Structure formats: C-alpha cells, structure tokens
Curated annotation (Swiss-Prot):
Lineage of the species this protein comes from: Eukaryota, Metazoa, Ecdysozoa, Nematoda, Chromadorea
Subcellular location as annotated: Membrane
GO molecular function: transmembrane signaling receptor activity
GO biological process terms on file: sensory perception of chemical stimulus
Pfam families in alphabetical order: Srg
Annotated transmembrane regions: 3-23, 35-55, 68-88, 124-144, 152-172, 201-221, 228-248
PANTHER family: SERPENTINE RECEPTOR CLASS GAMMA, SERPENTINE RECEPTOR CLASS GAMMA-RELATED
Family: Belongs to the nematode receptor-like protein srg family.
Record's keyword terms, sorted: Membrane, Transmembrane, Transmembrane helix
This protein's name: Serpentine receptor class gamma-46
Keyword Ribosomal protein part of the UniProt annotation: no
Keyword hit for Transmembrane helix: yes
Amino acid sequence: MTVLMLIWMSYGPISIALSVVIFCILAVSLKFKSIFYRIVQFDILMNTVFYVNCITYKLKTIEEYHRVLLLIFESYPSLFILREGLSFWAYRFQCSSLLLKCIFRFTYAKYPFAAEIWKKHYRLIMVSTIFYSILLTIPFVFITKEHHGFDYYAFTMNIETVIYLLLTIYLGRLTKLSLKKRSKRFAESIKKLNNYIYCDLFIHGVAFFGVMIPKMLSFEWTEETKDYILTFTVDAINLASTYIIIICDSNLRKILFCHTKKLTTSVFQVSAVPVSKLIVSPQ
C-alpha cells in the first residue's frame, strides 16, 4: 500500500461515516428545522458523493486496483464518463453552493420574509443550483489541462475562484449594510450562519492562495507531487462542510458527543454484568 493510501485510510473512512451521521442528525432532530440546515445537508450529500468519486483516483496508485479499474472502465465506458464528469463538476458545484449560502445570508438579513420564500422554493433553488453549476462545468471539459508546461486548467480555475471571491465579498458588504437596519438580537441570531460561511471561505482561500496558485507557478514540481497536493486539497474541500458545521454549531456537538458518550457507557455496562447473570439456566 502506498503512502498516499495509508494517509487517506487514516481519515477517509472515518470522515465518510461522520458525514453520514451528521446528515442523519440534521434530518431527524427537531432542533434543526431551519432552511439553513437543509442547505448544509445538501452540501454534505453532494460533497460526500464527490469524495467517494475521488477514491477511484486514489486507488489507481495501487497497481492491482489500477488494473481492475481499467478493466471496469473498459467494460463500462459510461462509468468512466461519470467519474470524469463528477470530478469536473465538483469544484463548480462547491463554488456555486458557497455563493448560494452568501445569497441566502444576504436575503435573510435584508428581507424579514426571506426565510419563508426559501422554505417554499427550496427544491427549485437546489435544482437550479445544480443546473447552473453543470452549465459552468461544460467549458472546462474542453480546456487543455497543460500546454508547453503551462497549466491552463489551473489558470482558468484561479480566474473562476477570483470571480467567486469578489462576488462573496460584495454580498458580504451588502449583508453588513442590511444588518445595520436590523436589531442586535437578529444580528446575534445570524452569527452561526456567518461563522459557517467564514470557515467555508477560509478553506477555499487556503486552496486558492496556498495550493492552486503555487501549483500553477511551480514548474519544477513533478506531476506526482502536483497530483498528491491536489488530491489532499480536494479532500479538504469535500470534507469541509461536515467538519465546519460541527465546529460552528454547539447544538449539533452536544447531540453528537452525547450519543457517543451513551454508546461508550452502554458498552462498559455490558462488560460489567456478573458472569453468573449471563449464564442461561437449563430448561
């Protein structure tokens, strides 16, 4: 097993399981009825799909699995097209989703009835976001990734990221102006949403300034090094929504850790039962 796979195994399966648990808690618990949590659920669901799709890229670093993958893709070309399509679509969707959350925060801050409108048209908004992000993905399919040592794909992604960054800053400014007209109590209630978006922006900022720009400018890096860096960057973005909501939401943390504590306690209680009581008497 390669070093890449060993590192991934240390956090990958746990993160997938945690994403499923968080998604279920948000769906079932009555404490999370707000439309904001439906958007977070949508994020977690799509990012988990993208994350699972990325596993096939990691498996190709192991020769045995690489041969199996090639055989599968040769037998079912549609699976290969689906994998490549999801990999192209992932970043477009994540940027669109980030912009969607900023729009939600702005409308929620400016219009008192915004939450009801979002709740009423939630499915339409989500479908529109998916459709919009797919349209944005189409041009990137035809962009040559690298030519004469210059990474055109990374360059185009950087331009795309700058555009989204400027849009989020602009919407943030409008939101701040709108909050001045609302009560302090309302401004306090929106703090959780602010923290979530700030963390999301931070992750995208690190990916942009710390990874994508150096990746594009560092011609002396080997392709293997670039692939490793890109793989873990993609993982960070795909897993961000799960860990961010845990960090930002105290109610979710209480439920999550309470369930964990109860599970641990019950395990110890079973172990502490006297042996005599575990023996079934003959009939």
